[in-house]
Regions:
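Intrinsically disordered, low-complexity Ser/Thr/Pro/Gly-rich regulatory segments
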Residues: 1-366
């Protein structure tokens, strides 16, 4: 009976950990078989799942999460997962904050909490918050630090993951989707531009094309954030190029590139352009986004759809998504004439202006 209860207990917390991981999918944009720093993404997730399940079980039992021996932890997880202890050790290290990487992770405010913290050469402290909040964002940052070349060389794989996540919103057979990126060429044969994803709705005759931007979920400096912004806004040229191509050749020609059999029976009557960033899509400065397209982040899309895919009975999903994104206002921009806030710090006062322009106006008016 005790063995049966223990097995049932383990199965319960395994399911609970799996549920936690499913909710964290947005944090890591690499496919399971991608290998970075000696481990596949699947191995990192398997190790994290074990850690989450164990930590939740100990918490529910009322047991304090006391520091554990790293070597014993590695041996236990390697046995449970039937994996090479050396590989498991590398995965454990990637979830650990220590003296070597602390400054890197602390360089930017608001970063993900560490799942594990090294206390000495062989003892690791656990963090329930770190394990159950944004552990894969911590892992992403750490992999970039530990294996920068492999991390960047694998970045192209994130587009396919993003594409599959997008297509999961359109599961019904009424939708036809491009298998991969589509290149659009000029009459001379040179590439004009490309489209990352296409969805065609056979029920309504609407076609949506998507430019997908799979950014890093963080920037370590203003310069890096500016590069991310400029990379995103390069989509202006892509949107313009696709619309010019469509004006010349027609949406039905694009539908042929997506699925020639569908194009023989159906016609594309309306086109909706989209630009989606995995994490970033809205900036307070830089070039003006091409408003012929709907711009949004992936979390924004999930919020607008309540995390649900479109149903077979929905009237016009592509038009609905386009309208929701264009009407949504994710940036809460302060008005220029809003007064500065004052914060008391001892006998001093700190004035916080809504923008640099507001600060300059205040200084010039003195």
């Amino acid at each position: 009976n005790e063995l049966r209860e223990a097995g049932s207990d383990d199965a319960h917390y395994h399911r609970l950990a799996t549920t936690h991981l499913a909710g964290m999918a947005y944090q890591l944009g690499y496919p399971p078989d991608a290998e970075i720093d000696g481990c596949t993404i699947q191995t990192y997730c398997d190790v994290l799942s074990w850690l989450i399940g164990y930590a939740l079980r100990e918490r529910d039992r009322g047991e304090p999460l006391t520091p554990r021996s790293e070597s014993m932890l590695i041996a236990t997880i390697a046995s449970a997962l039937r994996a090479d202890p050396t590989v498991i050790g590398r995965a454990i290290t990637a979830f650990t904050l220590d003296g070597e990487n602390a400054a890197y992770h602390a360089a930017v405010p608001g970063v993900a909490s560490a799942p594990l913290v090294r206390l000495d050469a062989d003892r690791l402290a656990w963090s329930i918050h770190g394990l159950t909040s944004e552990p894969l964002l911590f892992l992403t940052r750490e992999l970039r630090r530990r294996a920068a070349e492999a991390y960047h060389n694998s970045a192209f794989l994130r587009e396919d993951v993003f594409r599959r996540d997008l297509y999961a919103l359109f599961p019904d057979k009424r939708f036809v989707m491009s298998a991969s990126r589509i290149e659009l060429r000029r009459e001379s044969g040179n590439i004009r531009t490309d489209i990352d994803a296409v969805v065609f709705d056979r029920k309504t005759g609407t076609l949506g094309f998507f430019e997908l931007k799979s950014q890093d979920p963080f920037a370590r400096s203003t310069a890096e954030l500016t590069r991310q912004r400029d990379n995103l806004l390069y989509a202006n040229r892509q949107v313009s190029g696709v619309l010019a191509w469509l004006q010349r050749y027609g949406a039905d020609e694009l539908l042929k590139r997506v699925d020639s059999r569908t194009a023989k029976t159906f016609r594309a009557h309306k086109v909706f352009p989209f630009v989606l960033g995995r994490y970033l899509a809205h900036f307070g400065d830089g070039a003006e986004p091409d408003r012929r397209a709907a711009w949004g982040t992936w979390p924004q899309v999930l919020r607008l759809l309540d995390g649900q895919s479109f149903r077979p009975t929905d009237a016009n999903p592509l038009a609905s998504l386009f309208n929701r994104l264009t009407r949504d206002t994710p940036l809460d921009l302060a008005t220029p004439d809003e007064p500065a806030r004052q914060i008391a710090i001892g006998r001093s006062r700190l004035r916080v202006h809504t923008s640099y322009a507001a600060y300059k106006t205040s200084v010039d008016s003195r």
